[in-house]
């Protein structure tokens, strides 16, 4: 895949300029990403409609932001591009019952995550362009960076190209979000979906949370104070992740002590070894062949019994009780919560 700089491609710049004045975009959903997309695109000169259930919790918020709010079916009827920015598990029903009967012929259907299309939960009409545009950051960050004249990198993909302009539409949309100010990378629905799920399951969410819990349990079972264990395996994780974020693993190693570096080199591979990688491959295989998605759909349709059980077990883990007590004394956290509503995974919560 290649990085794309649309600012250096005159034909794409011309397409974007000409499209702004004519393209009507319907944003379906007004959560973290939906609101950021709608505001940024409007500020970039596009005509925006927001599609929401009448009387829903976000309708008043969208209206307060100055948007025309219509029901999703009406918004789809009037739009040239329909951006589906709702949670994954409601998209199939939304598309089949609301969007498919109403979206006009030749319009563009846009997703911010490829799960439903990649696993054929949604089969878009053949008379539509179908694209993906995903900012690599939470909605609050997408909006904040745009407002100060910068942008969050975006990835994009094309699934169907009826008009022969689907790629340019995706790039135009990404540019309207501010992505062209940073970086835009071409991908596929398959690559975006499978890597996104793998990252969440094996590293960012599943991997890290299980590692932290295991580290906490190891220290407490060895007789160390739970409070000290919490600080060492969870609280200080932010310091390390911030360094990762700024400059990768090598930057982190530059800023920790030589003792910590040596411990990294000799003990890290004892915890995360070749067998870990083999289990990661098994997780990836379940994602690639659709096993995970099949199980997730069955779980959702059954009313989430196991999901609720897993969630309750996490809530009851001793690290949560200790953490709650310690965080109550961290007065700076309250001010951070007040001033910053950004959560890294909220890019999925729309």
UniProtKB/Swiss-Prot annotation:
Catalytic activity: (2R)-2,3-dihydroxy-3-methylbutanoate + NADP(+) = (2S)-2-acetolactate + NADPH + H(+); (2R,3R)-2,3-dihydroxy-3-methylpentanoate + NADP(+) = (S)-2-ethyl-2-hydroxy-3-oxobutanoate + NADPH + H(+)
GO biological process, one term: isoleucine biosynthetic process
Required cofactor names: Mg(2+)
InterPro entries: 6-PGluconate_DH-like_C_sf (IPR008927), KARI (IPR013023), KARI_C (IPR000506), KARI_N (IPR013116), KARI_prok (IPR014359), NAD(P)-bd_dom_sf (IPR036291)
NCBIfam families: ilvC, PRK05479.1
Protein function: Involved in the biosynthesis of branched-chain amino acids (BCAA). Catalyzes an alkyl-migration followed by a ketol-acid reduction of (S)-2-acetolactate (S2AL) to yield (R)-2,3-dihydroxy-isovalerate. In the isomerase reaction, S2AL is rearranged via a Mg-dependent methyl migration to produce 3-hydroxy-3-methyl-2-ketobutyrate (HMKB). In the reductase reaction, this 2-ketoacid undergoes a metal-dependent reduction by NADPH to yield (R)-2,3-dihydroxy-isovalerate.
Protein name listed in UniProt: Ketol-acid reductoisomerase (NADP(+))
Organism, scientific name: Xylella fastidiosa (strain Temecula1 / ATCC 700964)
Taxonomic placement: Bacteria, Pseudomonadati, Pseudomonadota, Gammaproteobacteria, Lysobacterales
């Amino acid at each position: 895949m290649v990085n794309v700089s649309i600012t250096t491609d005159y034909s794409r710049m011309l397409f974007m300029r000409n499209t702004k004045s004519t393209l009507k975009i319907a944003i379906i959903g007004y959560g973290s990403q939906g609101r950021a997309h709608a505001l940024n695109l409007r500020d970039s000169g596009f005509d925006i409609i927001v599609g929401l259930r009448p009387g829903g919790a976000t309708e008043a918020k969208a209206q307060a932001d100055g948007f025309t709010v219509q029901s999703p079916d009406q918004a789809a009827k009037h739009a040239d591009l329909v951006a589906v920015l709702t949670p994954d598990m409601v998209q199939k029903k939304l598309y089949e019952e609301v969007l498919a009967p109403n979206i006009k012929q030749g319009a563009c259907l846009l997703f911010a995550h490829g799960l439903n299309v990649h696993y054929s939960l949604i089969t878009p009409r053949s008379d539509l362009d179908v694209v993906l545009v995903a900012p690599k950051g939470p909605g609050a960050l997408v909006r904040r960076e745009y407002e100060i004249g910068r942008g969050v990198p975006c990835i994009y993909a094309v699934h169907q190209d009826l008009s022969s302009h689907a790629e340019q539409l995706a790039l135009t949309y990404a540019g309207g979000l501010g992505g062209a100010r940073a970086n835009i990378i071409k991908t596929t629905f398959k690559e975006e979906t499978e890597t996104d799920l793998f990252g969440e399951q094996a590293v960012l969410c599943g991997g890290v949370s299980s590692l932290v819990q295991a580290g906490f349990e190891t220290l407490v079972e060895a007789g160390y104070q739970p409070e000290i264990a919490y600080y060492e395996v969870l609280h200080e994780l932010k310091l390390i992740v911030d360094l990762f974020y700024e400059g990768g693993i090598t930057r982190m190693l530059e800023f920790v002590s030589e003792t910590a570096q040596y411990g990294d080199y000799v003990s890290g591979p004892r915890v995360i070894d070749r067998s870990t990688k083999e289990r990661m491959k098994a997780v990836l295989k379940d994602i690639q062949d659709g096993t995970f998605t099949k199980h997730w759909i069955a779980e959702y349709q059954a009313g989430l019994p196991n999901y609720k059980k897993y969630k309750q077990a996490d809530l009851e883990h001793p690290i949560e009780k200790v953490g709650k007590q310690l965080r109550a004394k961290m007065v700076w956290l309250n001010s951070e919560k007040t001033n910053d509503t950004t959560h890294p995974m909220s890019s999925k919560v729309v």
